[in-house]
Structure formats: C-alpha cells, structure tokens
C-alpha cells in the first residue's frame, strides 16, 4: 500500500499501540503518536539535506483511541529524519530519541530556517558489556552537582571536547578524589536554549506604511540574545542534548560512555528532569523508565509541580532508582522494599545553616533538628549553596543580590538569602575581612559534613 507521495517503495501496515514514539523493528520502523481519529495525519520524511523526501498520509483505520500507530516497511533509520503533520501543522514527536537542528549551542544561523527542528531515531546499539548499578547507600552518598557545559568549558586539550560529556568523563578521577560518590547532572535532555521570537500575523490594513528609505532602516532580523543556560524548561525528554557532545550525531552514546565509566569507578549518575505543570503523566513515567533502561542512570532529581509522584514511587522498574523530590506521601510507598531510593530535596537545611553562620535570627533548636534529621523511609539532601541563589563565596560577601548585568533588572533569584558581607559589599582588600570570610567558608563546609543527611 503506497500512501501520499513518495519516491521510495514503502509499505504501511498497522503498528504497535503499546509503545509510543518511533523505533526500528527489523527492516521497518513503527511510528506511534497522539492524534484524534478525525485529524488529518501524515509522516513527513526528510533526507540528509533537510529536504522533504516523502510524505506518508496515515488513514484513520490506523487509529485506536487517541493514538495512531503505523509500521513503515523498508524504512532505514539512519537515512531519514521525520516530523508529524497533523491538520496541516508541523509537530515534533514528544517521544523522539534524537532531535536534529540543535547540534550547535546557541547557533544564531538557525534563524535562517525559522529555528526548525526535526526528529530522528536513536539506533540504541551501545554494548553495555557487564555494566551494573553501584546502588550506593545513603550513609555513603556524597553528591556533586554540575552543568555539563559550564563544568568542562575550561577543559585542557582538544577544543572540540570543551563543554561536552567527554570532557566531564575526563574529570571523573578529579571528582572521585574529592570524595564524591555520585554526580548530579543539570538537564541533559534536548531543550531549546535560544529565545525564539514569536511571530504575529498582522492584517494588511494594520501594517505600517514605510517609504523605501524607511524600509532600508528598519531591521527585521532582531534577535533576543538571552540563552537558557541551565535548561529548566520543557524539552524533548527522550533525546540527549546534542550540543553537549563532541560528536553531535553520537550524543546518546557519548552520554552512555560517561555513565559506563562512572559505574566502573563505583560512582552514580543522577539527572535532573524538569516537567511543567501540564506535562502528560504517561510521558513522564515513560521518560524515566527510558532513561533507566537506555542510559543506565542511577536516579532522578524531579522538578515541577503536579508530578505523578505516587505512580513514580510505586513503579516496580524504578524501585531501585534514586528519586529526589521535595516530598513524598509515605503512606503509598510499598512496605516490602529493601532498597532505600527516596530522598527529600528541599531548602530547609540551607536556611537554618545560613541563619546560624551569619547570626541572623538563628534558632539553634531548628539547626540541630536539621543536623540530625534522617527519615525512616527517605533520606535528606542537605546543601548550603546551590545554583538557585548565592554561591558559597557570595554568601559571606554580599548582603544583597546583584544580578543587574543579566537583563532581569535584578529581580531573579531569592530576594532574601540570609547572607552577610562582613563589612564590605563585594570583594575586599582588607585582610581581616578576607580572613573572616575564609573562616566562614570552612565553618559552612564543616557544618554540612557533620549533618546526618546526604
């Protein structure tokens, strides 16, 4: 059966409704995606130059419920990119395991093709050999949080490797020598780091009238240079950030090699996942399972409200995967679990510690409770500084935040940080101020190391 227009001899049959997304199955590919039976749906295949190679119109007979599923016989996964067209609108597969078009970080030339991206299929041919999960217990766990690009941009050697998984992999021994057992990666799923201008259609009668001279002086190509460096935004949760790889076409395997090397060193890899409020709960669960099975990650730090936390903690496949979140309903946690995989990650500890260190309304009873707290069914993640607010250095150097230079009018970040500048706002040349600050840094680290949590 040939459907749509196409120069290739593809044959379509019904697919597999139990697995959403696109994947290779023998000499064919199966595409399963969400759409209503009444929708006009097609799969657009692109060649390696990004040009349309084939359009496959999908009839309603291949739909069940709100899903379409079709098997495309004769499909070669590495030859084509794809996207869905639903009722004439270009749609990116939320289950795509590769995203094409963001291979270079903050690539301003993308404006030339309206920032378009397409989907690809990860071949998942990595040989894990005898890889095993370290399963580090919470009494031994020490967590090192990093941003792949920021952590390794100053890496020595080949410029190609700066800011990549490979550069992080080269620093595993450094992290291990510091005494850390686990690394926490800020988002490494594919996300849009660029600020894409929103287009608005203006009726002809409302368009401004320019003279030829005026038109020459009007810039129609203004770009917002703000970059989402951290990645806390909705994303393509099944694809690895291609610009974090030394070889963008092999980003998935480069991350797998990083995880494999961590495991060989007895260390864990935990990844942050941010899900906005309206994210489909089935997609969230599928994404977490996929990262465990495909990338062998050891845990997740979950960010976002209204997440299906109960379903996550009850999921049998995730029962030995560390879950970091700001709270759990312990009444729904299975009682027969032998591995402690739940960790409460919130800012309670840092506030109590900062107030004591900087002598700001310190409550010693509260601090001692924070120092000794340890749940029966869940551990606690303790920290005094993080990427969400003051660094440890800033904590004893500034009374107030100073983010004027980042274009947010000094409004981003917490307005109250329980900090103290000890006599001078910002860096100081005075010896006694510098000595006080050094002592405070040491006090803070000692306080944290003596706490019962992670």
Where are the predicted features?
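An acidic-aromatic substrate-binding cleft motif
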Residues: 124-186, 190-191, 229-231
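Aromatic- and acidic-residue-enriched carbohydrate-binding clefts of CAZyme catalytic domains
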Residues: 157-163, 195-264, 275-294, 405-426
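Structural beta-strand segments of beta-rich domains
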Residues: 27-31
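Conserved, mostly hydrophobic/aromatic
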Residues: 33, 84, 146, 175, ...
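The feature marks proteins involved in alpha-glucan
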Residues: 8-26, 53-55, 62-145, 153-159
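Short proline/glycine-enriched turn/loop motifs at strand-loop junctions of beta-rich domains
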Residues: 35-40
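Active-site neighborhood of glycoside hydrolase catalytic domains
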Residues: 254-257, 261-332
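Conserved alpha/beta catalytic core and glycan-binding cleft of carbohydrate-active enzymes
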Residues: 296, 309-454
């Amino acid at each position: 059966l040939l459907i749509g227009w196409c120069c290739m001899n593809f044959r379509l049959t019904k697919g597999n409704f139990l697995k959403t997304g696109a994947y290779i199955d023998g000499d064919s590919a199966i595409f399963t995606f969400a759409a209503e039976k009444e929708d006009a749906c097609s799969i657009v295949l692109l060649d390696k130059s990004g040009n349309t190679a084939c359009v496959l119109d999908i009839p309603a007979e291949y739909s069940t419920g709100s899903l379409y599923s079709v098997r495309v016989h004769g499909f070669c996964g590495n030859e084509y990119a794809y996207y869905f067209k639903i009722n004439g609108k270009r749609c990116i597969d939320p289950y795509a395991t590769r995203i094409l078009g963001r291979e270079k970080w903050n690539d301003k030339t993308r404006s030339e093709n309206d920032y378009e991206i397409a989907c690809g299929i990860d071949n998942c041919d990595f040989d894990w050999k005898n890889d095993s999960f370290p399963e580090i217990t919470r009494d031994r766990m020490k967590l090192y949080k990093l941003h792949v690009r920021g952590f390794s941009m100053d890496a020595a050697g080949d410029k190609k490797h700066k800011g990549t998984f490979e550069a992080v992999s080269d620093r595993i021994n450094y992290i291990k020598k510091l005494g850390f057992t686990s690394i926490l990666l800020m988002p490494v799923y594919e996300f849009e780091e660029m600020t894409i201008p929103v287009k608005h259609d203006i009726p002809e009668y409302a368009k401004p009238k320019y003279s030829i001279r005026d038109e020459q002086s009007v810039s129609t190509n203004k770009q917002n240079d703000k970059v989402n460096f951290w990645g806390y935004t909705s994303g393509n949760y099944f694809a690895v950030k291609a610009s974090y790889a030394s070889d963008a076409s092999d980003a998935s395997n480069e991350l797998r090699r990083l995880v494999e090397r961590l495991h060989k060193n007895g260390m864990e890899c935990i990844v942050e996942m941010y899900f906005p409020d309206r994210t489909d709960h089935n997609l969230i669960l599928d994404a977490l399972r996929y990262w465990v099975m495909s990338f062998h990650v050891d845990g997740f730090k979950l960010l976002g409200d209204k997440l299906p936390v109960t379903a996550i903690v009850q999921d049998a496949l995730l029962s030995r995967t560390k879950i970091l979140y700001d709270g759990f309903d312990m009444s729904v946690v299975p009682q027969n679990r032998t591995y402690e995989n739940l960790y409460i990650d919130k800012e309670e500890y840092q506030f109590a510690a900062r107030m004591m260190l900087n002598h700001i309304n310190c409550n010693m009873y509260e601090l001692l409770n924070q120092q000794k707290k340890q749940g029966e069914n869940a551990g606690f993640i303790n920290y005094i500084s993080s990427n969400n607010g003051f660094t440890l250095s800033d904590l004893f150097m500034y009374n107030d935040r100073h983010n004027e230079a980042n274009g947010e009018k000094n409004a981003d970040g917490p307005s109250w940080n329980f900090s103290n500048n000890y006599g001078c706002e910002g860096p100081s040349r005075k010896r006694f101020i510098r000595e006080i600050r050094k002592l405070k840094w040491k006090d803070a680290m000692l306080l944290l190391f003596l706490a019962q949590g992670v």
